[in-house]
Amino acid sequence: MLRSPRRLLVLDDDPTGSQCVHDVSVAFEEDAALLRRTLAEAGSTCFVLTNTRALGEDDAVAANRRIVEGVLGGAGDAAPEGLHVVSRSDSTLRGHVIAEPNAIADVLEAAGRPVDAFLFCPAMIEAGRYTRQDVHYAVVQGEELRVEETDFAQDATFGYAHSDLREFLEEKSGGEVPADEVLSISLEDIREGGVERVVEVLAGASGRRWVVVNALEYSDMEVVADAVTELEARGRVFVTRCGPSFVRPLAGQEGARVLGGEEIRAAEGAPAAGAEPSRDAAGTAAGAQLASAASAGARAEHGLVVVGSHVGLTTRQLRAVQERGTLTEFELDVARLLDESSREAHIEETVSSIRAELGRNDCVVYTSRERVSTEDPEESLAIARSVSDAVVRVVAGVRGALPAWVVAKGGITSHEVAHRGLGIRLATVAGQFFPGQISLFRPDAAPEETLGCPYVVFPGNVGGEQALADVVDRLRSVGR
């Protein structure tokens, strides 16, 4: 791969996009000065967790605009040289596919950087998500399916009917992006023509042209990334909409870091140099005592698993954890959470019970498996936010018990648990439990009771049926 000085700003619509990279920063807040500092060095990468998949389109657009405007800076502020903005989203095509890249392009254009093309590469190789002849596929229980045939396509908010990515873009844009106007970088272009041919295809794109990137392997995406590097050196501007895999070659990384026991144990140590605790507890006597206790290894012996995702794979993974019979289970009943007369008592009872149990056993808390949704996408999002808020309150209530580790299952769940439940402002991706899947975050800026607590981000639609149980077993064995 060509070395690139690009600074990669990744707007991640849930916390799962960094699972194919390591030693990169992950910010949970929109602090413009902080983001510019993380991008100070050429070749640096910073993920900003926007959680926009949990927002309506207008709010998602506003968040994208705010972040990019902040990083570009106002009068007197120097924008990071060589900035490439990535709109990172789902490898099974959910999210605000059209609106978010356009919001980013609007800001770049206002700053004098008109966007030539949107690169669309939803692949996640490790999870069996790839694109061939412009059709996107997902391997489900060993069977290759067009993504329109999977339960991901039935999502209450972001459902879709097409797997051909050109037709998908036309569908999602309401016809504003005609399928026959979408360019394509084919596998033949990549494997037979190489960088030179891909440069030729991309050089023909202008005016925010959508370009589908076909990819079956990382080597395919590396060729495309090299072509992008060459064209950016000539002044061309691209915005990328992609799944997790394409971020790795854009960031200049050639391999994954699979964590061993020592690396997992190291995540329990001190935060990275330059990190700071959150302002809410810093400087207090109680905070100092708590930080000292946590760093001295006084965390509870047992950890907490939080499950919020409702995709079929997550339910099967939860069942595998239950079958091993090694955790105490707590169910948050969605019907009770949506009933104002029972909501508060249900949350308080759950917090109290988990805090007591962490002294004896690992715990798993999950929302009831019956999906509650309506035909109105905005109302479905409101229900999801109400349930997510309850999960966050449970975690916030439990964190003072200093769990040994926390695993969050589900994209929206893991963002909310990290930021609002555990109070994480900035973290470093230590690596993954499996190649390109399931990241371990080391909190760098967080409340003292969270510093030193390894945090595992486990997407709802990733991993084999035993993967969640295996991650819990590895965390448990490291702590012994």
Label each residue range with its predicted role.
Residues 19-49, 349-358, 429-448:
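N-terminal short beta-loop-beta anion/metal-coordinating cradle
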Residues 1-12, 19-22, 35-37, 42-44, ...:
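Cap/lid and interdomain-hinge subdomains that line or gate substrate/regulatory clefts
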Residues 135-274, 279-283, 287-350:
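Conserved, well-structured core segments that form the ligand-binding/active-site neighborhood
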Residues 11-12, 47-50, 87-88, 119-123, ...:
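Short beta-strand segments
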Residues 354, 358-411:
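C-terminal structural cap/anchor segments
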